[in-house]
């Protein structure tokens, strides 16, 4: 048996208004959440080695530096590494701070030896746009700057020492790809390049990581990172690279 229920226009209007009012807070909340800034901070340890050559100024000896992470631990003065990301809708900002202080010895002609110390600080700042490639995958395309400060000192016992304090800025372009492997597992690959004789002759870096979600806003990561720079100016040369595993923890808020 079919039962008919009569509704007056006033009742229908009230019902429609009630349904719209009931739905408005959820829609507004979703829109507000999508437009809100989201941040994440990742302090990490970089078990890096150092390979390259240093000539602090024209006429100074060129010293080759080649140290593994275990070698660096013996002479490491200090190190600090942290990465941060901010997102709002499809826009993304990223910053990465890296500091490492190392030293080494090298043989010179005539039976002499030289001591080399390098203090390298870099700050990479980029901004760009995020694209969703699939429900599990997204890519950030960004551009920005890498600021360098490199302090180098070469000393020859009984002869003398030479110092160099070099600061410069490199333009960089960057890409970051993320893929969700499983509900709590993801992988991340990042690469950038720049310099192109604006600051340094050339600089580039790449790193990849596998990430595990421990809690809603906490992730742990393991991966590998390589960073390289080749700077030459008026006889001065700073050409070195750093490579090694990374271990970090990410906090989202």
What are these regions (language model features)?
Residues 27-99, 248-252:
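Short glycine/proline- and aromatic-enriched beta-strand/turn motifs that initiate or cap beta-hairpins
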Residues 52-70, 101-118, 149-165, 231-238:
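Flexible, solvent-exposed loop segments that connect beta-strands
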Residues 35-37, 76-80, 119-123, 137, ...:
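Residues that define the transmembrane beta-barrel architecture of outer-membrane proteins
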């Amino acid at each position: 048996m079919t039962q008919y229920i009569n509704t007056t226009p006033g009742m229908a209007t009230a019902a429609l208004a009630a349904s719209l009012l009931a739905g408005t807070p959820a829609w507004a909340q979703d829109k507000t959440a999508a437009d809100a800034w989201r941040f994440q901070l990742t302090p990490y340890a970089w078990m890096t080695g150092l390979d390259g050559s240093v000539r602090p100024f024209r006429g100074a000896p060129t010293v080759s530096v080649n140290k593994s992470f275990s070698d660096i631990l013996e002479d490491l003065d200090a190190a600090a590494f942290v990465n941060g990301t901010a997102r709002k809708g499809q826009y993304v900002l990223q910053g990465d701070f890296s500091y490492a202080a190392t030293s080494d010895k090298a043989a010179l002609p005539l039976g002499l030896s030289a001591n080399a110390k390098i203090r390298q600080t870099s700050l990479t700042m980029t901004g760009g746009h995020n694209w969703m490639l699939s429900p599990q995958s997204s890519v950030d395309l960004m551009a920005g700057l890498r600021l360098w400060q490199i302090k180098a000192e070469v000393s020859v016992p009984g002869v003398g020492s030479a110092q160099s304090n070099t600061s410069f800025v490199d333009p960089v372009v960057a890409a970051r790809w993320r893929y969700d492997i499983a509900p709590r597992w993801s992988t991340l690959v990042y690469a950038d390049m720049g310099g192109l004789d604006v600051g340094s002759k050339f600089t580039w870096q790449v790193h990849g990581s596998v990430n595990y979600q421990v809690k809603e806003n906490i992730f742990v990561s393991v991966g590998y990172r390589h960073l390289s720079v080749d700077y030459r100016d008026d006889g001065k040369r700073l050409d070195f690279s750093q490579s090694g595993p990374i271990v970090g923890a990410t906090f989202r808020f």
